C-alpha cells in the first residue's frame, strides 16, 4: 500500500472510530458491535440527560436533556474534518517521488 494513501485515510478512520465509540458509550448510538440497530430501541437518540456533576447546574435544565448534535457540532465537523484531510494531503505530497 502506498504510504500517502495511508497518511490521508488514517485521520478520517481514526476520527470515525472514536466518534462511533464515544457516541455509543454515551448511549447516543444504540447499535450492536456490527453496527446494526438493537432490537426494541431506536438506533439513534439525539437528546441525552447527562449525569449530575459539579459542572452541570441543577436548575434550568430541560427535562428531555440537551441535544447532542447542534449547529456548533456541525460547524466543528465541517471545519475540522476537511482541515485534517487537507493537511494530510499536503503532507502526502511531500513524499512524492519524481
UniProtKB/Swiss-Prot annotation:
Recorded topology in the membrane: Multi-pass membrane protein
Entry's localization field: Membrane
SUPFAM superfamilies: Cytochrome b559 subunits
The keyword Ion transport is assigned to this record: no
InterPro entries to which the protein is assigned, alphabetical: PSII_cyt_b559_N
Keywords attached to this entry: Membrane, Transmembrane, Transmembrane helix
Gene Ontology BP, a term: photosynthesis
Transmembrane parts of this sequence: 5-25, 73-93
Main location: membrane
GO cellular-component term (any): membrane
The keyword Transmembrane is assigned to this record: yes
One family name in Pfam for this protein: Cytochrom_B559
Known function: Unknown. Resembles PsbF, one of the subunits of the photosystem II reaction center. However, it encodes asparagine rather than histidine at the site PsbF uses to bind heme.
NCBIfam families reported in the protein's UniProt record: PRK02561.1-4
Stated family: Belongs to the PsbE/PsbF family.
UniProt protein name: PsbF-like protein
Organism: Prochlorococcus marinus (strain MIT 9312)
